[in-house]
Structure formats: C-alpha cells, structure tokens
C-alpha cells in the first residue's frame, strides 16, 4: 500500500512539466507511445481530434451544427459495424446528414469561439426574433429507418449567429404553438 | 491472429460494463479479463477494479463510488423500463440477450440511431447519452448523474499503468499494431459520453412518444423547404464536461406543417456583415436594450418560468 501511494505521488509532476502553457492543468493520459496532449471533446468527454478547431468530437460537431473542416462528411463507419464483423455487408452503414442543409452564410471557424463573460451577461433570457428555418433530412445509422425531417434554424441575437437543428417531436394535439408555415 | 485479437477486444467492453452494473461477478470473468488485457495490452481495467477499495480516501474515488451506487439504482429502473419498452413497441422486437454471456452480449448490443455508439437497451429513443441530450429528448434512462468523463477515467487508469513495469512491457508489445488499442479505447469512450445541458423547460407529456417516427411520405412533402418567420427563443445554459466556462445557447420550439420541432441553437460566432439583413439588427437592437427581452406581442412561453433553472422543470412550460 505504501509503495502504491508513493508511486501515485510521483506521477503528477511529469505531466505538469510536459504541459506548462495550458492554463487548466488537465492530467490527461500521457503515454510514451502516443503523442502528448490529446484533446477531449468539450461537450461529452470523448476523445477529439487535434485538428478540430472547436475541440469537439464528430458527434458533437454534428449536433451543434458546426462547419468543421476536420469532421467532414466521409465514408465513416460506426464502431458497432466494425464490432459486428460477422456480416461484411453491414459496413456500408454511414452517418448521413443531407448536404442540402448547408447554410448560405459561410462562417469561418474561429479558434476562440467561446462566449466572453460580458457578452453572456448581455444575452436576453427570452427573445422573439425573425429566423430562417430550412428543411433538412436526418438519416439514421441503420438503413431500416426512414429519413427523418428536421429543420435547421439560424437566428442573429446580440450580434452573434446561433444555429442548430430542430428535431421532430410529434403532432401538436393541444394547439399550443402557432403554425409558422401559415404566416 | 488479428481477428482473434479484435474478438478479444470485443469481449472486454461488455464484461466491464456488466461489472460496473453489478450483474456479473466472479473470478472466471476476472481471469478472462486479465487474459484478454494481457493479450492486448489493456491492463488498466482490472487494476482499476482492484485499486478501487484501496483509494477510498481520495475525493475523485468517492465520486466513482457514488457513480457505482447511481448505476445500481439505475439498474432497477432499467429493468422496469425494458419491460415497458417491450410492452409498448411490439413491432420492433429487440434482442432478449441481456444477462447472458459476454459473447451474445456483444452481438445483442443496441446502437445509437444517430451516431452508432453503443446505446443502452433501456433507452426508449434508442440513442446514446450524447444524442439524447443534443436532441432534447427527456429520456428517463439518461438522467443527469454524478457521471465521470472518459478523460478523467483514463487519467486514473494511466497512473498505475505508468508505474507498473509489466503493463509498460505489454504496451510496448502492442505498439506495433495500432488498430486494437484504438478500438479498445473507443469502446471505453462510448460507454461514458454526456453533455450537461440545463434547460428550464421540459417538453410536455403529449410529445413524449416512444415511437417518434414521422408519418408517411405524403405528409412529409407538405412541409415547406424554407420558412422565414419570427419565433421565440429561450436562453439556456450549456455546461461543458470539464470545469470550464459555461456557454449559453437558445432553445426553440416551433410548429411547422402542424408538427412540432424542437432543438438547440448554438453560438457560431460573430455575424458577418454581409450575411443578414439589417431588419434583424434593428429588431435585435431594440430587444437588447430591454434586458428582459419581452416582446410586444404575447409570448408563446410562460413569462414566470425560470430561465436558468436546473433540469427537470415543470412539464407545462410550453402551454400559454
């Protein structure tokens, strides 16, 4: 027990020496074989690529609607398909988001996309603003499911552009919301 | 030989998951885990399980123990939800190999419909934690808990590994082939993925349907391709996994074509000058002066709702 504790106490100083420039000292997994300083996704904690400017994994880049240069649409195969190697035809499954949902506004990815403190305090809690809703098609991983219709919304609030996907929730039985398409 | 290695990697992850859930316990599984770990260089999992009772003094381990307790509580909920899932959806028959061996556990793994990660069988939406959060589903399985991120888990695993010379030698032997270790690390990451989104309003009960599929192709064509209209956006706080700064996003609930769409709008950065018309700038300028952001027309969402409230608010927030 004492030996284990001594060994544990000796390991933190090398990581601090390895990363002197990062303000939040993260004791990430440092291995001699791997490259030092692996990134983790800021939303879900999964491992993110170093080239991603938004510091997020593929899933969170997709869900946030970022036009990430690194996580471009490709012939990516989910890990469950590679795990089930019994049938090779299942490797054709792909994560599909229709390319027609790309916005007209070409936003340049910025490394400092975080919101500053003064900007956050000035954000209104509730706002009614004109927005653009574009229909998009979200395809599930397995090809058995039909494509699902969603809407991509883009709005400008306090000089910032907010963008995201609105997913289908069901029929409005109680008529709680006014219909936007009838306006 | 490589295929055998891949299969051994497959066997490790569900056994680890079951051990955390408290379903499978025995020396045979420990031996099999140790053998697979020695073969592939993933010698961290048994060390973590073995080292847990010795490190009760540290705060992070206490969180881990709390996480174990929470999982045990969730395990009871999972069983009832699984029965409920079977009773509601009889058309989509899921695999009924929950408590069987690790081999069939790997074959019967439910995958997330959005990203392909490994999803829990008890989740009605058949999605992982990350996609349930991003889609705004009020999933009772993926409830906010004292979850520890994969990076911190790997951080704890590496400390005894770096000190252990035998584990170092196994890592050096596995350095020749990168694919098995990457797959192993991905399996560890898939089971621990979440994003803490604290929204003040939960969707009403009438929208929580186990089968959220859309109608046939005919009604889908009735939905317009593009709509320019004013909608109400509610500010929500999105918390990062680490203790970094929070970020604010906007939640929108709109009705298009008689159906309700809901989602989160994230900050993309400053607006380009040539991007949007000046009408929105003038409107936003007027709204920015008013700190409450109450518009002239009657708002769709109720004003007395707490904007920055925690998760699990009242269900009637969307009714006016």
Swiss-Prot record, chain A:
Residues 79-88 have a biased composition (Low complexity). Residues 41-68 bind DNA. Keywords: Activator, Auxin biosynthesis, Auxin signaling pathway, Developmental protein, DNA-binding, Metal-binding, Nucleus, Zinc. Its main location: nucleus. It comes from the Eukaryota. Residues 79-121 are annotated as: Disordered. One of its GO terms (molecular function) is metal ion binding. A motif (Required for homo- and heterodimerization) lies at residues 157-160. Zn(2+) 2 binds at residues 41, 57, 61, 68. Pfam families: DUF702. GO terms for biological process: auxin biosynthetic process; auxin-activated signaling pathway. Zn(2+) 1 binds at residues 41, 44, 52, 57. Belongs to the SHI protein family. This is Protein SHI RELATED SEQUENCE 6.
Swiss-Prot record, chain B:
Restricted to lateral root primordia. Homodimer. It comes from Arabidopsis thaliana. PANTHER family: PROTEIN LATERAL ROOT PRIMORDIUM 1. Residues 193-214 have a biased composition (Polar residues). InterPro entries: SHI, SHI_C, Znf_LRP1. GO terms for molecular function: DNA binding; DNA-binding transcription factor activity; metal ion binding; protein homodimerization activity. Zn(2+) 1 binds at residues 112, 115, 123, 128. GO terms for biological process: anther development; auxin biosynthetic process; auxin-activated signaling pathway; pollen development; response to auxin; root development. This is Protein LATERAL ROOT PRIMORDIUM 1. It is found in: Nucleus. Belongs to the SHI protein family. One of its GO terms (cellular component) is nucleus. Residues 90-110, 150-223 are annotated as: Disordered. A motif (Required for homo- and heterodimerization) lies at residues 256-259. Zn(2+) 2 binds at residues 112, 128, 132, 139. It comes from the Eukaryota. Residues 112-139 bind DNA. Keywords: Activator, Auxin biosynthesis, Auxin signaling pathway, Developmental protein, DNA-binding, Metal-binding, Nucleus, Zinc. Transcription activator that binds DNA on 5'-ACTCTAC-3' and promotes auxin homeostasis-regulating gene expression (e.g. YUC genes), as well as genes affecting stamen development, cell expansion and timing of flowering. Synergistically with other SHI-related proteins, regulates gynoecium, stamen and leaf development in a dose-dependent manner, controlling apical-basal patterning. Promotes style and stigma formation, and influence vascular development during gynoecium development. May also have a role in the formation and/or maintenance of the shoot apical meristem (SAM). Modulates root growth. Disruption phenotype: No visible phenotype. The gene is LRP1. Residues 168-177 have a biased composition (Low complexity). Induction: Expression repressed by LDL1 via histone H3 and H4 deacetylation.
